[in-house]
From Swiss-Prot:
GO terms, biological process: cell division; regulation of division septum assembly
InterPro entries: MinE (IPR005527), MinE_sf (IPR036707)
UniProt protein name: Cell division topological specificity factor
SUPFAM superfamilies associated with the record: Cell division protein MinE topological specificity domain
Function: Prevents the cell division inhibition by proteins MinC and MinD at internal division sites while permitting inhibition at polar sites. This ensures cell division at the proper site by restricting the formation of a division septum at the midpoint of the long axis of the cell.
Gene that this sequence comes from: minE
């Protein structure tokens, strides 16, 4: 094994690293839900109902997140997995 092969080799992430990354995602998601306004769950449900008027989807195919910055700026992020056309 040469010295160059050592630097080129990609190291596989350990299970501990993967678990840590997943936990960070879960904690960030829960913090976001905790800081969301009271009307957010109802608004999310209404958005899903409007999408269902036009496309047949499951609730788990819709992701709605509210990101809030310190600059009093809120961003509503909506991700919808749409079915393919027949």
């Amino acid at each position: 094994m040469s010295l160059l092969d050592y630097f080129r080799a990609k190291k596989e992430p350990t299970t501990a690293t993967t678990a840590k990354e997943r936990l960070q995602i879960i904690v960030a998601h829960q913090r976001g839900e905790r800081d969301a306004p009271d009307y957010f769950p109802a608004m999310k449900q209404e958005i899903i109902e409007v999408i269902r008027k036009y496309v047949q989807i499951d609730s788990d195919q819709v992701s709605v997140q509210l990101d809030q910055n310190d600059d009093n700026l809120s961003v509503l992020e909506l991700n919808v997995t749409l079915p393919e056309k027949p």
